């Protein structure tokens, strides 16, 4: 485990994380605290090259609180805390349009985690938007 390093990904939100992995966060309270603070400040964090088992991904997720399941998705065989979002001709995506994760719940989660396992060379983009920045940019009259 190295030192946590952040590189801004865009103006409104997001940062690339290097120097620590998902397993490091799950194993170290100090690393978790730094990553959580970075997440709060940047709203989206990107960890590159994290080909971890579902159990490790679940342990990482559980650091941030209770893991909620989405009723539309199956879980992995290795962990009930990790679900599979698939988009193939046989199983097209259920979330092709803009959405905000789990906002149908009375108390939606604070964070959402996504790990890309099989990603197409073209297309398949996932985009993020900052509701914080959008709200802050509203005119005072609104």
Stretches found by the model and what they are:
Residues 1-142:
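Non-heme Fe(II) oxygenase catalytic core, chiefly the N-lobe of the double-stranded beta-helix
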